[in-house]
Regions:
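Glycine- and acidic-residue-biased ligand/ion/polar-headgroup-sensing regions
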Residues: 74-93
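Double-stranded beta-helix
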Residues: 97, 103, 118-170
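His/acidic/aromatic-lined binding-pocket segments of jelly-roll/cupin-type domains
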Residues: 70, 76-81, 103, 111, ...
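Short acidic-glycine-tyrosine-enriched beta hairpin
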Residues: 93-115
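Short hydrophobic/aromatic-rich beta-strand segments that constitute the beta-sheet cores
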Residues: 46, 88-90, 131
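A short, N-terminal "cap"/entry segment at the start of jelly-roll beta-barrel domains
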Residues: 1-54, 68, 164-169
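Histidine-centered metal-chelating micro-motifs
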Residues: 66-68, 108-120, 137-138
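Conserved short histidine dyad/triad with adjacent acidic residue
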Residues: 57-74
Length: 170
C-alpha cells in the first residue's frame, strides 16, 4: 500500500478548496427550491445538498403537536417539507445569551439546522417532511450520541405560539 499524496499536501488542498466555498453561517435557515421547471404536468423544484446524506427519515406530524426540543452535537440536519407548515424555534446553545428565534417553514422549503443549535417544531398544520442527515441515528443512542434532549419550548409556550403567531408580518 502506498499513499499517493503526503499529509501536508492533502491538508493544504482541503484548506484551499474549503476556503473557496460560500458557506452560510446562520444557525438555521430556510431555502426555497431553485431552478424550477414547470409545465402542464406540474413542477420540479431542486434543493442542492452540500454534503453526503446516508439517512432519510419520513416524518408525519399532526397539527397542534410539538417535536424536537433537542440538538445535535455533530450533525447538520436538513428537513425538506412536502406538506404542511411549522413554526421552528431555535437557539444557539454555545452562546449563553442567545435569544430564541422563530421562523415559519412551509411546503416545498428546506430547513437547515447547524450542530449545537437547539430546535423545536410546533406544527400549525398536518405536516410531512423528509429528515436528511449524515451519520448514525440508532434509536438506542438517542440522548447519547446523535441527538441530545434540550427542552426549551414547553406546552404553554407551544399553545401561545399556536394562538398568537403573526404569519402575515414575517
Amino acid at each position: 500500500f502506498k499513499f499517493l499524496y503526503g499529509l501536508d499536501q492533502s491538508i493544504q488542498e482541503m484548506i484551499f478548496r474549503w476556503s473557496k466555498q460560500n458557506l452560510i453561517k446562520d444557525l438555521e435557515h430556510v431555502r426555497d427550491g431553485e431552478n424550477e421547471y414547470i409545465d402542464v404536468r406540474g413542477k420540479i423544484s431542486n434543493h442542492e445538498l452540500t454534503e453526503p446524506i446516508n439517512l432519510i427519515g419520513l416524518i408525519d406530524s399532526k397539527k397542534g403537536t410539538i417535536r424536537a426540543n433537542h440538538y445535535h452535537p455533530q450533525q447538520e440536519q436538513k428537513c425538506l417539507f412536502t406538506e404542511g407548515q411549522v413554526i421552528e424555534i431555535f437557539q444557539d446553545i454555545l452562546n449563553l445569551n442567545a435569544p430564541k428565534i422563530t421562523q415559519v417553514v412551509s411546503k416545498g422549503q428546506l430547513s437547515i439546522i447547524k450542530p449545537n443549535v437547539a430546535h423545536t417544531m410546533v406544527f400549525t398544520k398536518d405536516t410531512t417532511f423528509l429528515n436528511l442527515v449524515r451519520g448514525e441515528r440508532e434509536h438506542d443512542n438517542y440522548g447519547i450520541t446523535h441527538t441530545i434532549k434540550h427542552v426549551f419550548v414547553d406546552e404553554k409556550e407551544k399553545n401561545m405560539l399556536l394562538s398568537n403567531y403573526k404569519f402575515e408580518c414575517r
